[in-house]
Amino acid sequence: MKQPSFSTPHCQNVKPAAGFTLIELLVVIAIIAILAALLLPALAGVKNRAQMAADINNCKQIMLSTILYGNNNEEHFPQNGWDMNVKNWGADALSTATPPGLMQLGPATGGTKADYDRLYLPIQVPAFRKGLFGSYLQNPLVLRCPSDVENVNLYRRQQYLSSYIMNGAVTKFVKGVTARFSDPDVRGNNIVMWENDETRVPTPANGNAYQGQWNDFSNFPDEGISTRHGDGAMIATADGAAFRMDMRDFYKLAGTYPSGFPGGGSAPGNGVGTSKNNTSNGNTATAPNELWWYQ
């Protein structure tokens, strides 16, 4: 009887599968790196567009609250926060102390996120709810630009609650008065609010300059606009519209200075709180316009 053979002559001729060579591996890694370099900016752009969409929605909601407030208050705009002893759109009142019912401002020298979340946000949110918009704007998170929460300068502000500020024009750039929607100088395309310039915050390095930039809920137009979204920022107008405005267009209306930086409405040489039509410091704005509502 012939015994079965267990030899595998054919298998002896099979060569093991070859692995990747070093060069092939490096080529694959290079291709992955190129694809990542191409995709990451696109993904960042998608994220930024999503944040801007939420940003515009925030502005619309705040502006709707402004219009509703006007409808219920003889067409007046709300107090903007320059008079710290009365209710305004962002709070019941403002204070650097800790009396009950007032919005306590954070320190000009800054702090950490934990400090602000623990010490100031628990006070500033209830103060907002007691302010003029408390019954119109139920969710205080609407006051924050989605990309602002990633900004370290957020924790060097006194007014920690809102990324947006109102135009000082709503009180005619002075304390104690408020404009009306029905005023002849108020037009539908007048800019009522915008994203504040997050780069201008008080720090020990600059001698706590710009302390007035974030100590309330309103600014002069030439105190600056946000750079979070590149060369434009969100604004809202008196007719309720909200959109992204090119920074160059904003500063054509607001007025710029030789340094290229916004000067601030209360800068030296600008008279009583306005830089409109003032060229002594190089301001190029001509009032009235969409930002400087009044001559």
Residue spans of the language-model regions?
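Generic N-terminal simple sequence motifs
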Residues: S5, Q12-N13, A37, E74, ...
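Generic alpha-helix initiation/capping and coil-helix boundary signal
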Residues: S7-H10, I23, I29, M63
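N-terminal leader/signal peptides at the extreme start of proteins
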Residues: M1-F20
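Amphipathic alpha-helical segments typified by the pilin-like N-terminal helix
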Residues: A17-N57
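Acidic/proline-rich low-complexity IDRs
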Residues: T8, T21-L25, I34-A42, A93, ...
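Residue-level signal for well-ordered alpha-helical scaffold segments within enzymatic catalytic domains
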Residues: P4-F6, A30, A37, P41, ...
